[in-house]
From Swiss-Prot:
GO terms for molecular function: tRNA (guanine(37)-N1)-methyltransferase activity. Its main location: cytoplasm. It is found in: Cytoplasm. Homodimer. It holds the Pfam family tRNA_m1G_MT. Its EC number is 2.1.1.228. Keywords: Cytoplasm, Methyltransferase, S-adenosyl-L-methionine, Transferase, tRNA processing. This is tRNA (guanine-N(1)-)-methyltransferase. S-adenosyl-L-methionine binds at residues 116, 136-141.
Amino acid sequence: MASLRIEVISLFPEMFSAISEYGITSRAVKQGLLQLTCWNPRDYTTDRHHTVDDRPFGGGPGMVMKIKPLEDALVQARQAAGDAAKVIYLSPQGRQLNQAAVRELAQEEAIILIAGRYEGIDERFIEAHVDEEWSIGDYVLSGGELPAMVLIDAVTRLLPGALGHVDSAEEDSFTDGLLDCPHYTRPEVYADQRVPDVLLSGNHAHIRRWRLQQSLGRTYERRADLLESRSLSGEEKKLLAEYIRERDDS
């Protein structure tokens, strides 16, 4: 059974228990679909204080992660993952992660993730060892651990067998370039709000059409930029036009 190996270099490996012990990612680990190992640069320091950071040259606020502990941790991660493993640094300066990138990463056999802290890591480490830099958005976090967990969760969902239903990943938002449609469950009526009749009809063709139309409409209203990069079929254009017309008439 094929599996994905992910090595994480982080000063806070305990944070990744959220991945290994809970939810879909935990199930993937237990099933052998995902192999997750963390490496702490502090374990590769030689001074009594286990120093992993220092002041930046040129002055300025904050501290910068030192090269040597990172490199030594990376050596161990490479031995575990193999020399072909892609090294990814989670950084606000990186390319923004999207579903297309997640699909590509899910095809890898092994990935090494670098979770920085403080003001960042020494640029010489990035130049020498990092293959790609990825960001999860235009905002600043305290470290790379949360972005790394976001990436791991998103990639794990696409591993064959990770989800309970084979179609679940394909029906998620962004998988086909659209936002997801609304979902409902029991009861049929709650606080005088009814589930749309089409979902109770049992007509699978009508349900598929309704869900596609809702996805198109939501994307148009909330993320119109996604439609600019997606070529709509004739059916999709018709459904979107109907959605807009019905919305404007209501």
